[in-house]
Curated annotation (Swiss-Prot):
Crosslink site: Glycyl lysine isopeptide (Lys-Gly) (interchain with G-Cter in ubiquitin): K71
Renumbered residue ranges of the record's region Core: 38-48
Glycoprotein keyword on record: no
Family annotation (Gene3D superfamilies): Tat domain (4.10.20.10)
Any single biological process term in GO: positive regulation of transcription elongation by RNA polymerase II
Organism: Human immunodeficiency virus type 1 group M subtype D (isolate ELI) (HIV-1)
Biased composition regions of type Basic and acidic residues, renumbered to the chain: 83-93
Modified-residue entries (Asymmetric dimethylarginine), positions: R52, R53
UniProt short sequence motif Nuclear localization signal, RNA-binding (TAR), and protein transduction, positions renumbered to this chain: 49-57
Name recorded for this polypeptide: Protein Tat
Comment text on domains: The cell attachment site mediates the interaction with ITGAV/ITGB3 and ITGA5/ITGB1 integrins, leading to vascular cell migration and invasion. This interaction also provides endothelial cells with the adhesion signal they require to grow in response to mitogens. The Cys-rich region may bind 2 zinc ions. This region is involved in binding to KAT5.
Region entry Cysteine-rich, spans: 22-37
């Protein structure tokens, strides 16, 4: 390892800065450009402020794409409308007449 001038700050050491500035390209070469590019572009880790996404407003024209939903009739109980009690009585009466 080459000796480094002790009076030089660490961020000014030779080889500490890449020769070209960082850019917004995400190609393989630019992802490995420097440690910061690798973290941000290669791994997707960013410690900066997160941008707030703006909500999209409703499209002009209001209800152009909305179809009204028809009212459904209230649900009715399924099965025999006479009810379970009358069925039990029928079964009991049939059981008495069989023997």
């Amino acid at each position: 390892m080459d000796p480094v001038d002790p009076n030089l700050e660490p961020w000014n050491h030779p080889g500490s800065q890449p020769r070209t500035p960082c850019n917004k390209c995400h190609c393989k070469k630019c992802c490995y450009h420097c440690p910061v590019c690798f973290l941000n572009k290669g791994l997707g880790i960013s410690y900066g402020r997160k941008k707030r996404r703006q909500r999209r407003g409703p499209p002009q024209g209001g209800q152009a794409h909305q179809v009204p939903i028809p009212k459904q009739p209230s649900s009715q109980p399924r099965g025999d409308p006479t009810g379970p009690k009358e069925q039990k009585k029928k079964v009991e009466s049939e059981a008495e007449t069989d023997p």
